[in-house]
Amino acid sequence: MRKPDSVAALTEFGRVRLSKSFFMRDFLFSDIAAVHGLSNVPDDPDLAIAAGSRLCEELLEPLQDRFGRIAIRSAFRSCEVNGLGNEMQAAGRGGYNCASNEANFAGHIWDRRDAQ
């Protein structure tokens, strides 16, 4: 899948089902992106879908089955969004809590593999 570059493509990407209860759109909101006018979409949608599916199927669905409905507000960060958050945090700006991009690969940044 190509990186969404239009409203229609982003809408379609957001409708990708990651598990029985979760869709990609559940994970894409970012306060940092909203405030700074940034796009919070993955450069590698296929890798992000694979990572998100594992998160949902292996962790979130079992938690939800045990404790009830889980509402996700945000989980994915693009490199651009995470990088800005890290810069703002390093500059002492309040409200930003982002590790470096490299430390967040395969963490918040789903479309990059970690070193392992």
Where in the sequence are the language-model features?
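Cell-envelope/glycan interface and biosynthesis
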Residues: 27-116
